């Protein structure tokens, strides 16, 4: 009888812990900025990235008609009063009293990187296609996105322990995990869905893992030597534990306007 009671209690505790963890996994990816706490799709985009408009020549669009109007500025944040939560001691909690915490994830001000491109082995560069905040992030090859300019350029806001927020040079918005993909949204240093861990790989690439959902950025590769002139969907998926191509990202020089190596008429 005693064993049965213990078994029932164990089952109850397992169910309780699972229910609690599931509740906090299925929360609003925009944090306190827009929508209800448990709304996993506040922008009503769906959970899968939908392909951009089929354009003969890829070009930037406004995209204001694709998403609802959302606050331009992030919600107010504060620093923690706890001596145990600071830049040296780690990450402040995401939740407080079954709501989002309003404290900064890290107490310190971030260092800011130089401008860079985030480029996958397939040639897919993380790119803002629709300028209005809340639109999906896509992967474009550099040659097919020449007209996008700084929408393909990023800066890292660098925090301790290889964490960073990733800010677009054109829109000044940050990468925000959303559903199974990524949107760009006003930078909010209290939102765990905007904080990314850079995990070094042996070939100088990095995996980019989201703090909020624990998943890594992926651009699926179907043909490593043939995936040219295509638009890549960008996902967040379970982080690969073994060798892979589609979760590798190189932080490399930005594609600002380059001068030609030779002028017309010069000997080559």
Swiss-Prot record:
Keyword set, alphabetical order = Cell outer membrane, Lectin, Lipoprotein, Membrane, Palmitate, Signal, Toxin, Virulence
| Major site of localization recorded for this protein | membrane
Lipidation positions, renumbered (N-palmitoyl cysteine): 20
The Ricin B-type lectin domain extends over 112-252
Q: Tell me how this protein sits in the membrane.
A: Lipid-anchor
CDD domains under this entry?
Answer: beta-trefoil_Ricin_CdtA (cd23414)
Q: Which Gene3D superfamilies match?
A: 2.80.10.50
**Compartments, record wording:** Cell outer membrane
Q: Where is the signal peptide?
A: 1-19
Q: Which InterPro entries match?
A: CDtoxinA, CDtoxinA/C, Ricin_B-like_lectins
Any one of the GO CC terms:
cell outer membrane
Q: Which GO terms describe its molecular function?
A: carbohydrate binding; toxin activity
Region (Mediates binding to target cells) residue spans: 129-140
Lipid-conjugated positions (S-diacylglycerol cysteine):
20
What does the UniProt function comment say about this protein? CDTs are cytotoxins which induce cell distension, growth arrest in G2/M phase, nucleus swelling, and chromatin fragmentation in HeLa cells.
Subunit annotation: Heterotrimer of 3 subunits, CdtA, CdtB and CdtC.
What this protein is called in its record is Cytolethal distending toxin subunit A
- Per the UniProt record, the source organism is Campylobacter jejuni subsp. jejuni serotype O:2 (strain ATCC 700819 / NCTC 11168)
Give the lineage.
Bacteria, Pseudomonadati, Campylobacterota, Epsilonproteobacteria, Campylobacterales
